[in-house]
Amino acid sequence: MNQNLHKLSNETVAIVLTKLEPISAFLKDKSLFEIVINRPYQVMTEGIEGWKTIEAPALSFDELMGIAKVVASYSKQKISDKNPILSATLPGNERIQIVIPPAVEKDTISMTIRKPSSRNFSLEELANKGLFSVCEQVSFTPLNDYQSRFSELKHIEHSLATAYSNKDFVSFLNQAVKCQKNILIAGKTGSGKTTLSKALIAKIPDNERIITIEDTPELVVPQPNYVSMIYSKDGQGLASVGPKELLESALRMRPDRILLQELRDGTAFYYIRNINSGHPGSITTVHASTALAAFEQMTLLVKESEGGGDLERDDIRGLLISMIDIIVQCKRVEGKFKVTEIYYDPFKQRNIFGGN
């Protein structure tokens, strides 16, 4: 039985790879970040040198629809007029987003393929590549007041604040992960959020039990004691479970940390529940334009969620400021991943907690 299932799985992968043959060269090209198809007979790629357009005579509308259906079958999902949007992971771990009519213009199909990094970089390696070369400190409390107010902080916060004030961001983030600070990585799509989150996750001590919650497998957890939980995006997939159900399950699985892959829609509310349940040390991502704007984005996401709709906006924002210790803003600058801002303000949190 197991051999039959293994054979069936291999056959399914072979069918997908055969269908993807017209773009296989782009999938194998390690210099590319993104592969997009906006319409039949054309492929666009993004690499270090920017966007390029390539004619693709083999990619007719029917051929693209064939790819969409095979990918849907491979990922145990459906794509049709009634379900025109598909999020999936290809056999090579590339993330693919497919949109077909009527959700896009007639006779067109949109495919966006995000290629995973060919290797995982350590925080130190990223720093040596200039990750923090343009980084600015962001806080509600004036930075000039930090040194004079160190005596207000506990020992670990004193050490963190010292590294932060000295712009020793590698030491700062290393300490932050080890002492289970809640870290939010913000930026737009393709800004390097996942690359940085992998580097930070690698800093979690090996003796901690980690539960990850994702809609597509992307996070790399090198620690031996971890469980990767997957929820069905938009109710697709074999199991109709969402982040709420997985979080409730994770809380019963003896976790030291629960890591949500990305905060959007209802997941932002469950992020608050996770932190508030006594499981700090979260490392997660959100789409936002600046570090402080991440608070506003999170407030909107929580407010729009089913669980947070009745909460007042100011209460949500205050709760987020009290719970999120660090926000790291990522951006791609001239084709290179950069951290442009780091928010850290223990004094603001201390005021919210009443000086405790």
Swiss-Prot record:
ATP binds at residues 187-194. Keywords: ATP-binding, Cell inner membrane, Cell membrane, Membrane, Nucleotide-binding, Transport, Virulence. The keyword GTP-binding does not apply. The keyword Membrane applies. One of its GO terms (molecular function) is ATP hydrolysis activity. It holds the Pfam family T2SSE. GO terms for biological process: secretion by the type IV secretion system. It is found in: Cell inner membrane. One of its GO terms (cellular component) is type IV secretion system complex. InterPro entries: AAA+_ATPase, P-loop_NTPase, T2SS/T4SS_dom, T4SS_GSP_E_ATPase, VirB11. SMART domains: AAA. It comes from the Bacteria. Component of the type IV secretion system VirB/VirD4 which could be a major virulence determinant for subversion of human endothelial cell (HEC) function. Altogether with VirB4, may be implicated in providing the energy, via hydrolysis of ATP, for the assembly of secretion system and substrate transport. Interacts with VirB9. Belongs to the GSP E family. This is Type IV secretion system protein VirB11. It comes from Bartonella quintana (strain Toulouse). The gene is virB11.
